[in-house]
């Protein structure tokens, strides 16, 4: 039985988006997971995962669309002015949580940059990506705003992050169509990003071990994200097709307990164009989708998780 409960840890902020469309697909695993959905402070959201038969437990915390908000700011939540955001607040919450469970997986769904004056040192200092490292973020992906400074800006940012010598989150995105670009001949910008990806170690997916739970995490860059990135020179495969191929590769080559996806695709009221809902339906072996991009909250309202 997969159960879902919802509640706020802290009433001071509006939560960032989380999507997990198809919880019952978890029952295809060798053991059952129980998810507890919690909305919390400063855009940090969490899951607790229990593998009852094997007595495995995993907490997952995640962010997305942080948009260079290294400092907190004032906004209106439920009709009242509240303080939200800020990496110091995030780090405090993470530290408090890790006192209870040090084996916590921390994910980010992209668009970690562009939105405050911090973005002015994006390409030279990689401040946002390095700060994700300080938070203890395990895996992140690219959003459309990571391309705002063009191909050279993204490449310079990745190289600057590596040059810092600091602990950095792993980065995953599975649907970049490198083969098509190589066949057509790299543009200078494509070449810059390709080389920066190699330097940083960007992969289609990565495998993380937390305690006795092994998790594969893949990344997806959505169609609407590409439409919102006019300076992006990269070519991309269909997100669902690329994710399906990557999941099959994971199932073939990795012995993991669950598969998670950090997706910068988003959800919409119209299910026909709601990209991460489509992804969840098209690739049911993905157990968890962290959905960024649209800054919306998709509520799971079905009385039965089998629906």
Regions found by a protein language model. Give the residues of each.
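Bacterial N-terminal signal peptides
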Residues: 34-42
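A short, hydrophobic C-terminal helix/tail in secreted or cell-surface proteins
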Residues: 303-307
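Short, Lys/Arg-enriched N-terminal segments with co-localized hydrophobic residues
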Residues: 6-23
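Sec-dependent signal peptide cleavage junction
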Residues: 43-53
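Acidic, metal/ion-coordinating pockets
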Residues: 52-302
């Amino acid at each position: 039985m997969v159960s879902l409960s919802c509640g706020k840890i802290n009433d001071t902020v509006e939560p960032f988006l989380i999507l997990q469309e198809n919880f019952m697909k978890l029952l295809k695993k060798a053991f059952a997971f129980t998810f507890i959905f919690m909305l919390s402070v400063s855009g940090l959201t969490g899951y607790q995962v229990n593998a009852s038969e094997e007595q495995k437990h995993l907490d997952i915390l995640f962010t997305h669309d942080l948009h260079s908000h290294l400092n907190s700011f004032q906004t209106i939540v439920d009709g009242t002015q509240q303080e939200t955001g800020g990496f110091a607040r995030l780090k405090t919450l993470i530290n408090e949580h890790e006192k209870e469970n040090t084996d916590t997986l921390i994910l980010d769904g992209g668009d970690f940059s562009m939105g405050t004056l911090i973005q002015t040192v994006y390409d030279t200092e990689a401040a946002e990506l390095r700060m994700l490292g300080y938070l203890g973020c395990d895996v992140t992906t690219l959003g459309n705003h990571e391309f705002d400074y063009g191909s050279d800006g993204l490449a310079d940012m990745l190289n600057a992050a590596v040059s810092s010598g600091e602990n950095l989150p792993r980065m995953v995105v599975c649907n970049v169509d490198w083969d098509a670009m190589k066949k057509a001949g790299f543009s200078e910008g494509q070449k810059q990003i390709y080389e920066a990806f190699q330097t940083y170690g960007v992969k289609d997916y990565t495998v993380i071990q937390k305690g006795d739970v092994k998790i594969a995490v893949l990344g997806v860059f959505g169609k609407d994200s590409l439409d919102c990135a006019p300076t992006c020179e990269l070519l991309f495969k269909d997100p669902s097709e690329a994710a399906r191929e990557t999941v099959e590769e994971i199932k073939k080559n990795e012995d993991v307990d669950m598969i998670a996806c950090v997706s910068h695709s988003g959800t919409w009221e119209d299910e026909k164009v709601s990209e991460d809902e489509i992804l969840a339906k098209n690739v049911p072996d993905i157990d968890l989708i962290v959905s960024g991009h649209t800054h919306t909250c998709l509520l799971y309202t079905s009385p039965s998780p089998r629906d």
